[in-house]
């Protein structure tokens, strides 16, 4: 008997289904950074907070005035885990102290990336989050089996080229799905 290798969702999007009850994930689009037999990690990419890069820089360096342009750089709620920790998902032309190479992207957790972005010498494309989404071994698979999520291929244009309020619908549209037409009710024949 042939056993199938597990299928993991690293470098894909998770689209929260319209009936998602968890307020941490309702109406979210999540980029999956890692997914393996030990669990999964992702970053919610469509939930801006009431913070900007300027606010973060003021906390990191209270004696220095951040550049005015940093007040236009939003900070996203990456998920409910470690919400005081920063994660920067960015294009891969730059590397920093704590950078992990992903498929065509990089993820950095060190402050030097924030300073580079503020100075105008950072990555061409970036998305800054506080916190991340985490799943224990088998948890994400169970949620997928319960139809809490749809997965779709990653498209950098959705993160880096669209307004945050368009990202969820754009990811669903890449599958030919209109989220407004989905229901959580099953039909009976």
UniProtKB/Swiss-Prot annotation:
Matching Pfam families: DUF179 (PF02622)
InterPro entries (UniProt xref): AlgH-like
HAMAP family according to UniProt: UPF0301
The name this protein goes by in its record: UPF0301 protein PputGB1_5045
PANTHER family per record: UNCHARACTERIZED PROTEIN YQGE, UPF0301 PROTEIN YQGE
GO cellular component: cytosol
Gene3D superfamilies referenced in this protein's UniProt entry, alphabetically: VC0467-like
Species of the source: Pseudomonas putida (strain GB-1)
């Amino acid at each position: 008997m042939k056993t199938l290798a597990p299928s993991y969702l690293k470098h894909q999007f998770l689209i929260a289904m319209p009936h998602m009850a968890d307020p941490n994930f309702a109406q979210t689009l999540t980029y999956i950074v890692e997914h393996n037999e030990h669990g999964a990690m992702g970053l919610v990419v469509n939930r801006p907070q009431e913070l900007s890069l300027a606010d973060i820089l003021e906390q990191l360096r209270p004696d220095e005035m951040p550049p005015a342009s940093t007040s236009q750089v939003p900070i996203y709620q990456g998920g409910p885990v470690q919400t005081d920790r920063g994660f920067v998902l960015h294009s891969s032309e730059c590397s920093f102290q704590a950078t992990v190479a992903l498929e065509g992207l990089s993820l950095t957790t060190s402050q030097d990336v924030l300073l580079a972005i503020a100075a105008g010498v950072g990555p061409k494309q970036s998305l800054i989050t506080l916190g991340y989404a985490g799943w224990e071994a088998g948890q994400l698979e169970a949620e997928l089996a319960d139809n809490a999520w749809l997965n779709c291929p990653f498209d950098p244009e959705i993160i880096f080229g669209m307004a945050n309020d368009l990202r969820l619908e754009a990811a669903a549209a890449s599958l030919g799905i209109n989220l407004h037409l989905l229901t959580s009710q099953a039909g009976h024949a």
